[in-house]
């Protein structure tokens, strides 16, 4: 950091400190108590709705008023008409807080069904007879190829008629001070009401409510009234909001909140609606460091001195404050704005990455371990077959062993230390990590570190739901274009993190020069970008290609891509141009040559075609559900230009190195 940049950063921090208010443990306790009470109210059986009707709401009357305000001509003049509309909207926002669940359902049904999208015939009937006939003549003349002067008033009426009245109503609500928060809360209630009453309502009404939800989402996404700014201790309201709405790492004390908002090289930024200046829609917490952080504890619990040579911008918490924002990409927008702001403040920082939770890992891993005994038996049988063979015929139809969580060395170590039979290691590990105190056994922690880290990598990259990553945090960052950079064991040992993620956290790196490519690869082809170091966790086989990528990583970031292929799916077709080099991480593929043969985990294909620019020689198809790592063709060629070692690699007989790879991998796996 230059002296000028340091002075600017210090001035910003000092200015914030001078105007900051000073809280204490009582202030924190009071706001946390309010937060817990609000959450308890929302989670109550009645959903926090008012049980007794205290304000009147009539669906038919409401529908009629909206139609009069928005669809009919107003003869009182623009100013008076606008004033009446705004007063009506303000009264609704005020009354809605007291609505019962039944009244809220009536309101959304009025908006979705009674004021929903109208067909063209109904829209035409709303036009005066003269305008209607003029429009018909215009359309007929245009259809016959004649030009006819258009009436601007007719065009305006048609345009308004094509916009649902509910959407026009939302636009009106958005212009008043409490409007945006009302719309967010209305969308929260809409989602709850759809789920509660889905089976009771007619199918057409449910579809109309779901369409209304999409209209509200898209309307909020297109509004240009967002403001990006820093959050610090200069505003008590803002500090209290962060305290109550932090979703990832709960604030535990006043000192904790101080560190996050005003600590050395700590920053917090938010996106605000112009009508909600003290309630950010989403906020992110950032720390500047000189390394890729692998634990959340030092960030949350230690007051560090300024880093002399900062190189990394670490995002350790992203919190959305309102579930009415679901389906919107506001958090992504905030991340990119924050990267832009932080790199302008610290231009020497070359790496922007997250330290993120893995909320679904514990459930997935325990379920996998519960089914692990059959995998262990299959693996043991296959290993005995491999030991008795001096040569593996590529044409041999050998069923591959199921993927185990343990290498031979790890299994032997655990057997010697704990006296557990290798065939029941999965059951043994499941029992160990089900103990709430397991993380306090330091010897156990070290002995299972590699097992847990590799398992988490498999979960992050290959656990899918309809081609999308199962883990919601991973799915969010990969859609943004980030890559899985590093898997961290025992990175968060708080009770909640141990319960949901067994202490695992992941670094997702945002490499800005290639972020568009990685984002589109995931959205269009379900390719999850992963660093070579993290890729080795799911493909722990010696590889010249991976070695060369890592050797050149300081000059060029070259991620691999993880993809799941379904059984029977064609991976590469004979005669086509090469697309990638493929690494089989799990499963089995069939090479349909004159003498067909299988490739299993630990093996590769596509090298010769990609490196030599040859067409694909044989069709390769997934025989089972198969997990692959890909190095795209363009990256292969770029790597080839910079690495002479690849020429020797591709020059060998493919069957020889396929057999060597198979033996090197399966000889060390259960």
Pin down the residues of each PLM region.
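Conserved beta-strand elements of beta-rich interaction domains across eukaryotes
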Residues: 276, 359, 513, 588-589, ...
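A small-molecule sensor/coupling module
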Residues: 610, 615-621, 627, 633-670
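Short acidic, glycine-rich loop/turn motifs
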Residues: 273-277, 591-593, 622
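Regulatory nucleotide-sensing modules
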Residues: 545-612, 616-618
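A generic structural signal for short coil/turn motifs at secondary-structure boundaries
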Residues: 323-327, 573, 608, 638-640
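Extended, composition-driven regions rather than compact fold-specific motifs
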Residues: 2-547, 670
